[in-house]
Structure formats: structure tokens, C-alpha cells
Amino acid sequence: MDFLAKDPRTIFLGQAVEYPGTAMTGTLKNVPKDKLYEIPVAEEMQLGITNGLALNNFIPVSMFPRWNFLLLATNQLINHLDKFEIMSQGQFKTKVIIRTSIGSQRPLHPQHQHVGDFSEAFKKVLTTVEIITLKHAKDILPSYEKALKRDDGKSTILVEYGDYYNEK
């Protein structure tokens, strides 16, 4: 996240962004505090704020600890973020980076509502949002670089594996 934080247009928002609470929190320890915006557990509102920031030329990095939480923002994702360019006849090409994960299953399986991977299903309905599943640690930095530097008018969902935080 240090790489993303260097860009003056980036803002990090989500649950446990400014205060500890998820495995992702530790990855933000070097991000300046003025770039961190803690959001209450209100996923649709979070992605709505994210969309508004993107429409104002920021590059929001919106963090959802697990896919299962991102599901609650589906309206903002499918009906808004994915359609801005189409609805505006090309006037708005927003860039959003959504960070999520598939919940850790080791050392203890947390139950099925925490380990969902909906990547393939969402790939079928999203046209201006690319989903990149980070299967190997070596893919992480190049994928975030692509998300930040892309100029094709697409936003990016980066899907991490929760077990990386415990094992890598």
C-alpha cells in the first residue's frame, strides 16, 4: 500500500483502515494518517462515497475485508461504478481500486459466510471493472501498479487470499 500512498490522488477508506480490526490493517501502517478514512459498517454507503471521490478525480482505494462484505455494495458496484462511462456517454471514466479478500481458512475455518469468492460471477456482469485474483504473492505489487497506472477507463477489484497474511 506504500506504493499507492505515494500518489497524491489516492485516499484509503473502509472498515479497520485507520483503527486495527482486520488483517489488512497492518498493510496500511506506513500510509499517512491524512489519507485514511475510517468508514462504519455500511458497505453500500462506503462504495457510494468511493464513487463520489472517483467522480471528483481522486483514486479511492476502498477496502472490504472480505468478498462477503463487498456483496452488500453490489448496487453501487454494478448499477453505478460499472455504468458511469456508459451513462455519461464517455464523459466520466472513473478509476477506483477495490481491495477485498477471500477469508482465511487456516488455522480455523470461520464458516462459509466469511470465505466466499464471487470473482467469477461478478466477471460476468461487470464491463468497466476488472477483477484480478492475486493467486501468488509475486502478483500483488504488479497488479496494484496496473490498477493505479491504467488509462483504459477501468476500475479494478483486487482479490487477495486471507491465508497470505498468516502464511506469507
Model-derived features with residue positions:
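Thiamine diphosphate
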Residues: 1-167
